[in-house]
């Protein structure tokens, strides 16, 4: 009986050895095999100490949610949902006008429609709230908003004496029928000279805009004499009526983000009267004291992340090869690289025309920041 059991046991051992050899031949098992080892997803793995840049692109978009903003592409939908959450959690602590502004923005995003005139007016009314939230958060930003050119000129005299930089969103024309806003980046130099770089998100050649720049230059000369230099950079990223308030706020913040570049431009403007040796777009305007430059020739790619049109990105790429592939992600929470081309695709909507709604998502984000600050 015992002999019979031993024979059966040896037979089983031989069978096990044969099975192991068979599986090894398939690459399964053994210390060197990895085909069936447990896989740890990258997102759950500890980050590499050598990692300095984010992955090139995010995973595929999640399927449309059942939220009230499901008509929007994934990226702007998430920003709308984040604003909606902020209204619910922080709205009772915020100024009523800011809450109404947030709700009007959410309503526009929910309908997935172009910006209305009433929302543009709310941009103007609530701009001080948005400006304050950023100025309180960013060191030495010195961001202000001005409802008239006269208010800006009056306050500029005070800043002129401090020697501090100033960034501002300024209404370009005294005419109450004209709402257009632009961003001003200002440096007050030790020599007593002041340099101003105006950032026009649309076209400075627009007949409704250029008279404001010429008049501003005249008033600056009257106030400061020869101790003032004034440049205008037209980005032509804004292609729709309205939107200038949020665009200009974004440009003031972008100038702060790119302040080392702007510091050098201001030095050039003070010492040489030009920026990077670039010739003005219009000799006639230059004779009037308005040094006009084309934005696609020199502005960093970050200034075009909210551009409405593919054509604008193509022009930027033609003037600055490689710019359309530049990583323009922002914020501490940014995980993936984001090129201008990819952003244009991810924020594209089809309404009366096909264009990027990135600036609308930026409005939602800026309002959320104001609610949470």
UniProtKB/Swiss-Prot annotation:
Classification via InterPro entries: Ser/Thr_acetyltransferase, YopJ-like
Active-site residues annotated for this sequence: 180, 200, 244
EC number: 2.3.1.-
Recorded catalytic activity of this chain's protein: L-threonyl-[protein] + acetyl-CoA = O-acetyl-L-threonyl-[protein] + CoA; L-seryl-[protein] + acetyl-CoA = O-acetyl-L-seryl-[protein] + CoA
Acyltransferase among keywords: yes
Null mutant phenotype: No longer inhibits growth of bacteria encoding this gene on tomato cv. Hawaii 7998.
UniProt KW keywords: Acyltransferase, Secreted, Transferase, Virulence
Biased composition (Low complexity): 43-54
Sites where the protein binds CoA: 180, 239-240, 308-311
Feature: compositional bias, Basic and acidic residues: 79-89
Gene Ontology MF terms: acyltransferase activity
GO cellular component: extracellular region
Ranges where the record places region Disordered: 29-89
Location relative to the cell: Secreted
Keyword Chloroplast: no
Family: Belongs to the acetyltransferase YopJ family.
Role played: Serine/threonine-protein acetyltransferase translocated into infected cells, which mediates acetylation of serine and threonine residues of host target proteins. Induces a hypersensitive response (HR) in tomato cv. Hawaii 7998 (S.lycopersicum) carrying the resistance gene.
Designated name of the protein: Serine/threonine-protein acetyltransferase AvrRxv
């Amino acid at each position: 009986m015992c002999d019979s059991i031993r024979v059966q046991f040896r037979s089983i051992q031989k069978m096990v050895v044969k099975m192991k050899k068979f599986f090894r031949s398939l690459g399964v098992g053994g210390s060197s095999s990895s085909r069936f080892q447990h896989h740890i997803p990258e997102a759950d793995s500890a980050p590499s100490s050598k990692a300095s840049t984010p992955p090139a692109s995010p995973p595929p978009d999640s399927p449309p949610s059942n939220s009230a903003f499901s008509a929007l592409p994934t990226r702007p939908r998430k920003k709308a949902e984040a604003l909606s959450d902020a209204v619910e959690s922080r709205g009772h602590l915020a100024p009523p006008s800011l809450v109404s502004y947030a709700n009007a923005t959410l309503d526009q995003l929910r309908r997935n429609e172009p910006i209305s005139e009433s929302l543009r007016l709310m941009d103007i009314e609530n701009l001080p709230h948005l400006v304050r939230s950023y100025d309180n958060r960013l060191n030495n930003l010195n961001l202000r908003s001005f409802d008239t050119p006269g208010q800006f000129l009056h306050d500029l005299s005070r800043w002129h004496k401090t020697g501090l930089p100033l960034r501002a969103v300024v209404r370009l024309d005294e005419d109450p029928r004209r709402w257009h806003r632009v961003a001003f980046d200002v440096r007050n130099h030790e020599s007593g000279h002041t340099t101003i770089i105006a950032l026009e998100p649309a076209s400075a050649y627009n007949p409704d805009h250029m008279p404001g720049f010429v008049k501003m230059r005249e008033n600056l000369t009257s106030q400061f004499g020869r101790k003032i230099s004034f440049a205008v950079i037209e980005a032509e990223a804004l292609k729709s009526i309205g939107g200038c308030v949020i665009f200009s706020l974004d440009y003031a913040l972008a100038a702060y983000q790119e302040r080392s570049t702007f510091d050098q431009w201001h030095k050039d403007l003070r010492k040489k009267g030009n920026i990077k040796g670039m010739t003005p777009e219009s000799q006639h305007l230059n004779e009037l004291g308005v040094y006009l430059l084309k934005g696609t020739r020199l502005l960093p790619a970050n200034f075009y992340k909210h551009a409405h049109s593919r054509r604008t990105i193509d022009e930027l790429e033609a003037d600055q090869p490689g710019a359309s592939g530049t990583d323009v992600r922002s914020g501490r929470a940014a995980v993936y690289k984001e090129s201008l081309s990819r952003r244009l695709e991810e924020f594209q909507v089809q309404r009366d025309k096909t264009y990027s709604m990135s600036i609308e998502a930026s409005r939602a984000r800026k309002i959320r920041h104001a609610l949470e600050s």
